[in-house]
């Protein structure tokens, strides 16, 4: 596992990953953890070419780019700079804003820092990650907007966010929160909420929700549904579904504290992905664990560009 035996402090990190060559060697092992394997013929030997960023199969001659198909594809910046940025992002307990990354990395523009951060956030979601299981609390909340929204499920100007968090079973129920999932949803209809659950919660998990009609079909969908009859007040919901409402509060404070609330609907999903990544690794024994995990994910993520990131938009 690459996440082991990695440096926790900045001086040690720079000694380990201070050169492009050191970073290339580590990235090679992340991309081919069991050793090089040609995608064309399956041969296990290759020759390094072009400063070791391209590897040519010794059998069939097919060339494999170390960076192609990763978040680093087509970068004009050395890998040591990328590794440093990832370390700064993952080693900061509360995260780091684009403006702060610009300052620490000495970038010439805010756009560069913003783009790098969004590329890094894309690597915070592992492709094919496992869905939540056992007992899960599920609810929705609203994020953003210039003014406090109206009570209930109709809040103009705010993004709708669905959340699910594992709470355990039996004696451990509610004592220690497990994994978390958050996502921006188009609305709180049954179709939207069941779609969120289908992507994030395994069947036949036990799903605790309030009595909203959007959850009425969960039993038929294959879940063990625990509908709770709650009043319309926030206090009742927070009392009966404490885990997910605790997480909602933490996420909103994180958005306000690290990013000063300056997160629009268009890119909110990416920021939620970062919060989930951090929350799910909150018990890591050292700071290097999130860094190692993110590098492993980075070689599995399809590349993107600033233009694509700007054009992307989530549900209203």
List the predicted regions and their residue ranges:
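Residue-level recognition of single "structural anchor" positions
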Residues: 1-316
């Amino acid at each position: 596992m690459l996440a082991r035996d990695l440096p926790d402090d900045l001086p040690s990190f720079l000694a380990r990953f201070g050169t492009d060559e050191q970073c290339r060697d580590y990235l090679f092992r992340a991309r081919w953890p069991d050793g090089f394997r040609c995608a064309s013929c399956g041969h296990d030997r290759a020759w390094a070419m072009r400063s070791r960023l391209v590897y040519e199969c010794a059998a069939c001659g097919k060339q494999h780019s170390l960076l192609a198909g990763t978040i680093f594809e087509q970068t004009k910046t050395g890998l040591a700079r990328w590794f440093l940025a990832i370390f700064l992002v993952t080693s900061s307990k509360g995260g780091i804003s684009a403006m702060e990354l610009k300052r620490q990395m000495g970038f010439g523009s805010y756009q560069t820092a913003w783009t790098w951060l969004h590329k890094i956030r894309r690597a915070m979601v592992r492709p094919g990650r496992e869905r939540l299981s056992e007992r899960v609390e599920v609810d929705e909340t609203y994020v953003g907007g210039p003014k406090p929204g109206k009570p209930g499920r109709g809040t103009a100007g705010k993004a709708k966010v669905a959340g699910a968090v594992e709470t355990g079973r039996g004696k451990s129920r509610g004592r220690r929160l497990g994994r978390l999932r958050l996502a921006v949803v188009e609305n709180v209809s049954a179709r939207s909420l069941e779609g969120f659950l289908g992507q994030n919660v395994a069947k036949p998990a036990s799903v605790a929700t309030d009595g909203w009609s959007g959850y009425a079909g969960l039993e038929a969908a294959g879940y063990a549904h625990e509908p709770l009859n709650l009043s319309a007040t926030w206090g009742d919901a927070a009392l009966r579904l404490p885990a997910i409402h605790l997480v909602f509060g933490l996420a909103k404070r994180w958005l306000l504290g690290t990013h000063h609330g300056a997160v629009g609907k268009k890119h909110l999903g990416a920021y939620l992905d970062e919060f989930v990544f951090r929350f799910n690794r909150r018990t890591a024994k050292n700071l290097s664990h999130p860094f190692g995990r993110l590098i492993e994910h980075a070689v599995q993520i399809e590349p993107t560009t600033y233009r694509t990131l700007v054009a992307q938009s989530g549900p209203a």
